Regions:
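RNA substrate-binding interface of SAM-dependent RNA methyltransferases
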Residues: 8, 15, 30, 44, ...
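N-terminal positively charged helical leader segments and presequences
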Residues: 1-66
Length: 152
């Protein structure tokens, strides 16, 4: 599981029709029209909504002034390296021990925009599902397969 924060990410996840999400909503934010829209669409996708008090939300959130909505998203299944080599078609971006999470997220975002088939990360690279990578990918982490911890 990994965390995604904010209304835009919630909308991106819903637009991709990803189901079975746990959505934490800060108390008092549910009245917001945008959050109501997330509730309506999320119910159709079997999302579980939990209201969370502000102190707990601050503890969970990685941002100083969050929007009061956090998603717990299941990491997609990714083939292991031998399977990957047999089925590797298209254009891929290879990151060899890129450790800066902001750079990894930006490269994932660029790879998605360029129409790449996936991103490969070798051992020693930043965790693609860390808070900073997910945030800097701006939702692109959901748009293409990410193969990580590869020993090439």
């Amino acid at each position: 599981m990994f965390l995604m924060e904010g209304l835009r990410n919630a909308e991106d996840v819903q637009n991709q029709e990803i189901s079975d999400i746990v959505c934490l909503v800060q108390s008092g934010r549910a009245e917001n029209g945008s959050v109501q829209h997330i509730f309506e669409r999320g119910e159709n996708l079997h999302w579980l909504f939990c209201e969370v008090e502000e102190p707990l939300m601050r503890l969970i959130s990685g941002t100083e002034n969050g929007q009061g909505i956090i998603l717990l998203v299941k990491q997609p299944y990714v083939m292991d390296y031998p399977q990957l080599l047999n089925g590797l078609h298209g254009k891929y971006v290879l990151l060899d021990t890129v450790q800066d999470p902001g750079n990894v997220g930006a490269i994932i975002r660029t790879a998605a925009a360029a129409g790449c088939s996936g991103v490969l990360l070798t051992k020693g690279s930043a965790d693609p599902y860390s808070e900073k990578v997910v945030r800097s990918s701006m939702g692109s982490i959901l748009r293409l397969p990410i193969y990580h911890d590869l020993d090439i």
